[in-house]
Amino acid sequence: SFSLNQISDRFPSEGFEARVAFWRAVFTQYGKQDVLLHDKNDLRLIYDVVRFTRGTGPGKSETRRQWRILRIRKKQLAAAMDSLRIRGLDSKKMDKTQQRILTVIQSAELEPSPLLFKKLRNNIHTQRGIKEKFQKGIIRSGIYLREMENTFDRHGLPKELALLPHVESSFNFASRSRRGAAGIWQFMRRTARAYNLRVNRSIDQRLDPLAATDAAARYLKDSYRKLGNWPLAITSYNHGQTGIARAKRRHGSNLLTIISKYQSRSFKYASKNFYVEFLAAVEVSKNYRTYWGPL
């Protein structure tokens, strides 16, 4: 089976192991019925998994109901952390939630302290599983993947980059985001036009997988030239070249350092995790039969 060590010279995974493991689980173990409550910075800390039998759907009222339940659960976790911070670790007085939090923290080899609980209570984040979505992405990618890999090859770029749409769009050819990005590569209009894709009333080449792949290859080539390594170039696909160049000026070219130190209103969970999601997506898509058999 494929392991990330096979591509490590271009796409280093050292130091990212825990993050990759988290996303591997989100892609393969947890489906749309599952929502993980976890720490947004330390992805080893998964406090709870809430199951919704209706999954993501149907209708807005179901979505609202789920968010209400998750909001309450987040408050319960935060309150449990406050209690641990104030009352200490007397196991006789602990409820199930407090015991669970303590177990999770200790299994990550962290030292429980009032300061730690104070920090963690503000970091509780939700992440829904996307197993079904990822499986569909594997099936859809089969149509064009060989040609997409050839495109990257032609540009002298690593073929693994052709797997980035697993993270961007699950290879949904008609994908449109609320922000106005479209196609498997989720190009915004302005970027698409800058890379010579035609976007007007009669044609939108962002929805043409092969034309968009060629534009994405040129974008990533530019990013790599400007930023100097693949972790930064790939992160810039989510965060923008300018933002990552600024982060590099401040903190150097190691993505791990940037993730822990760079402060910016727009450099949040999605940007911090984009590169590791790519690593997990490469690993899962190359090993998908191990997880699910033939699709």
Enumerate the language-model features and the residues they cover.
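Cell-wall polysaccharide-cleaving catalytic domain and substrate-binding groove, primarily
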Residues: E168-I184, T213-L220, H239-T242
